[in-house]
């Protein structure tokens, strides 16, 4: 609805009907996508899974903070490996501290097992006829697995409602803002408008382009691409090579900050996803 000012703020059925009629005649309303009942259910399930992932992350932070407070330091290279977990279980703090650590580790185990079970269920949901083909296409991109692909599909719905890839990137808030006055133009950070959840997923996926050789395809990526048409695989390979090359150019040649480069890659990844979902892959 257009903003109303002055006397036009008076609301009656007759005035409202007149305004709605004018807006419809002049095409001032933007079309919206009404998600199906199935999409809504899957979306809620995926967000529930992400809530558990966030809870697991917080428990990990609490365990590490507990060890730091009591001067327990792990000599290994990485946390949350099998060696690190065995080390945590072998600790013998005094008195009540042992019980505290055991409760933390129990919560960690419960959440880890639940996430594993939920991820298996997500694989089953993605295998449904209504999602299988679309999920398979999106999984051809580096950093995009079943959970991310299915989340983007049910969160966005109909990709064809966006006239261009730029419109889709704008919808999820990955385009830069602008503050213009007269002849002066000032570029701002990304708008962060629209669907925050999709933006977060694509930003996380873009981190995978910060490592690995340009043009290299891992065994896991080849397995995900298996079963798709040669045209789909070629389009995804072109996107993967371009995005990885652009990331290295921004960071190494232009000395851009890593987060700035990752956000730029996330925006282009969104554009390539739009092309994949609307069959603009020529």
Functional labels for PLM-detected ranges:
Residues 1-282:
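A detector of single, family-specific signature residues
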